[in-house]
Each structure stands twice: as structure tokens, then as C-alpha cells.
């Protein structure tokens, strides 16, 4: 069985930034990106009875040059984890970009910033969908420290497409 190289993106355990939303990101790089092979790999994943749902978005004909897979896995305690698996064309615009962002965040993140990010994540209503990079940019770049400040920051910095920020 051929297995494409995968890079765990968030590395949330290393930076200790996981709070409430059980979400793990992986980037899988191949050249060429074979849509059928991607579906075959996900079919194997779907055979695991702990995988409860899988979604797919084809972005091959965009600047992102990828396929987004989102799977929900139920752990032994009954908690659902979201696994975001982004299958990316090697050599495309975003090849390695998000891994570099994660490395830069790790390099500049202080304990005080980490705690501020965790506090904001904790205070975020469960119904609110916010990308991790929004928290990181608000805290690291703009010094946001309270949830009301964060709400205002988000109003002034709406997300449109891919967030291309790097500390």
C-alpha cells in the first residue's frame, strides 16, 4: 500500500494550545495529486467503525490546489474529534506554508501568550467556529487579551479565504 507523506500541522500538543475543540489537522502531499487514490485512502479510513462522518471539498482548481477531507472520529470516551486532512499538490502555492506558520508561532509564543490564547478559546461559545490562526494572530500580533477585544478584533479582521499571516 502506498502512503503519502503526512505532516501534522497544528502540533497542538507540543505547543499545548488544545482547549475545547477537538480538532487535529494533517497535510498530505503528493505529486501528482490523484483524486481516485485520495478517495481510496478515505474509503479505508471509513471502514473504521469509530469514524462517524466524512466530508469532502474539491479545491483542485483553486489557488489552494487541494482536496479537503474532514472526518469525525469517536474516541473511547465517546468524544468526537474532527480530523482535517488536506491533500495538497506538491509544489503548489501552499506546499509547506502552514507548517512554516506553525514553526514561527512556536518560535515566538511565550507562556503568557499561550495562556491568553487558551483563555480566549475557553471563553469562545461552543457554537462559534473560529480558526486557530485567528486567535494566534490576534494575541501575538495585536496584543488581544480579552474575549470582548477578540470579538472586536474579528469584526475588524474578517476572514476571506486563506489567512496568510505569519509571525
Residue ranges and their predicted role:
Residues 11-17, 56-61:
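Short, solvent-exposed loop/turn elements at beta->coil junctions and helix N-caps
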Amino acid at each position: 500500500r502506498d502512503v503519502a507523506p503526512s505532516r501534522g500541522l497544528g502540533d497542538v500538543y507540543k505547543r499545548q494550545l488544545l482547549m475545547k475543540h477537538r480538532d487535529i489537522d494533517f497535510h498530505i502531499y503528493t505529486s501528482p495529486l490523484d483524486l481516485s487514490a485520495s478517495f481510496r485512502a478515505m474509503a479505508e479510513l471509513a471502514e473504521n467503525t469509530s469514524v462517524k462522518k466524512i466530508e469532502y471539498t474539491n479545491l483542485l482548481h483553486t489557488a489552494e490546489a487541494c482536496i479537503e477531507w474532514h472526518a469525525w472520529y469517536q474516541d473511547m470516551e465517546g468524544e468526537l474529534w474532527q480530523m482535517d486532512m488536506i491533500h495538497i499538490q506538491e509544489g503548489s502555492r501552499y506546499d509547506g506554508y502552514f507548517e512554516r506558520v506553525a514553526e514561527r508561532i512556536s518560535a515566538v509564543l511565550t507562556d503568557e501568550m499561550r495562556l491568553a490564547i487558551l483563555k480566549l478559546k475557553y471563553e469562545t461559545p461552543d457554537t462559534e467556529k473560529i480558526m486557530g490562526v485567528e486567535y494566534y494572530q490576534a494575541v501575538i500580533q495585536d496584543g488581544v487579551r480579552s474575549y470582548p477585544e477578540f470579538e472586536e478584533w474579528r469584526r475588524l479582521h474578517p476572514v476571506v479565504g486563506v489567512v496568510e499571516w505569519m509571525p
